[in-house]
Amino acid sequence: MSAPVFGRLLTAMVTPMTFDGAVDLRRTGELAHKLVEEQNNDGIVVNGTTGESPTTTDSEKAEIVKAVVEAVGSDAAVVAGVGTNDTAHTIELAHQAAEAGADGLLVVTPYYSKPSQAGIIEHFTAVADATDLPIMLYDIPGRTGTPIETKTLIELADHARIVAVKDAKGLVVESATVMASTTLAYYSGDDAITPALLSVGGVGLVGTSTHFTGRRMHEVIDAYVDGRIDEALSTYREILPVLTGVFAAQGATMVKAGLAHQGFTVGRVRPPQTMPTPEQAETFFGVLDRTQL
């Protein structure tokens, strides 16, 4: 089986901040390098929700892409989140990411305004037409308010540059239906249900817990793809407490706390997000320590 265009394991990376809340570009590059070299990531997703994209400026987003591209070179794909609820602005960010050296684009469904499925098709098509970069659609109705319906995904798959989906909808049968009718590469957008998506044809994971579990999750995915299902599930069960525990608070906040616990400081989150409570943090630190990650 050929490897999917973005690889099998990507981490939706947090954005390191300095003590005074500025984007720490040096630490950004160091974290990206760490995720590739130590956690065996095939790709890094920047400027996504976990990267605090709602609170970073357009110019900061461009500098983040450049820093990560410089840090990982050709060792990993760099996928830039460019999704907004404004088609024109999304296209601007797509151009900016392409100029900054991104290898692909992550484009979320327009949020808050709840466009029709026809509007969603027009939006994604316009963004796909704007650059030569391959696109991963991001289907996360719990945050956007609007799902990408099965028939919409099947229609969008006809576009040559729409090649993948980050699926955080959690409806595995619907995902299987799309995969049966298209060549879209499906990545789990929910760390804990990765084996379920793999079982119906998914290719990998865009993860959050993979800041800590990346190497082990790659083992899970590789074993599953190779047909070593018992081995895959055994490893998965060992790390499952981390896959779920990282979401006991907002993902970015728990990741930043967990990295600091392991001696790799990346600063705090920008408002309105807040860091985990001491109780939440200590519980998660215990999970990390017991799992020996």
From Swiss-Prot:
One of its GO terms (cellular component) is cytosol. GO terms for molecular function: 4-hydroxy-tetrahydrodipicolinate synthase activity. The record marks 49, 112 as: Part of a proton relay during catalysis. Catalyzes the condensation of (S)-aspartate-beta-semialdehyde [(S)-ASA] and pyruvate to 4-hydroxy-tetrahydrodipicolinate (HTPA). Pathway: Amino-acid biosynthesis; L-lysine biosynthesis via DAP pathway; (S)-tetrahydrodipicolinate from L-aspartate: step 3/4. This is 4-hydroxy-tetrahydrodipicolinate synthase. InterPro entries: Aldolase_TIM, DapA, DapA-like, Schiff_base-form_aldolases_AS, Schiff_base-form_aldolases_CS. The active site is at residues 138, 166. It catalyses: L-aspartate 4-semialdehyde + pyruvate = (2S,4S)-4-hydroxy-2,3,4,5-tetrahydrodipicolinate + H2O + H(+). Gene3D superfamilies: Aldolase class I (3.20.20.70). One of its GO terms (biological process) is diaminopimelate biosynthetic process. Belongs to the DapA family. It comes from Cutibacterium acnes (strain DSM 16379 / KPA171202) (Propionibacterium acnes). Pyruvate binds at residues 50, 206. Pfam families: DHDPS. Homotetramer; dimer of dimers. It is found in: Cytoplasm. Keywords: Amino-acid biosynthesis, Cytoplasm, Diaminopimelate biosynthesis, Lyase, Lysine biosynthesis, Schiff base. Its EC number is 4.3.3.7.
